[in-house]
Amino acid sequence: MKVYIIGKVTGLHYQQCCEQFEEAHVKLEERGHKVVNPMRIVPEGTGWIEAMKICLRELIDCEAFYRLPNALTSKGALCELFVATELKLTEIL
């Protein structure tokens, strides 16, 4: 299943975000999923609006999403969660 990782990025240290998303990425791959990791597809330093455009294009092509624990504290992640749930993507627990 193609799974998109949703989590907070803005306001956190770049390296901390990379580590959190990468940990989830590895876990999901080990479970047999094809993973879309925003930290791998959005270049460091990209502005918020452009990053969201990149991420949302990728999200709508996925079948499922995985939510990091910090996702509910992020405007961008909440936007992604809204889109994912409205498109009836499966949440991977």
Predicted regions and their residues:
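Conserved catalytic or regulatory cores that recognize and/or transform ribose-phosphate-containing ligands
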Residues: 1-93
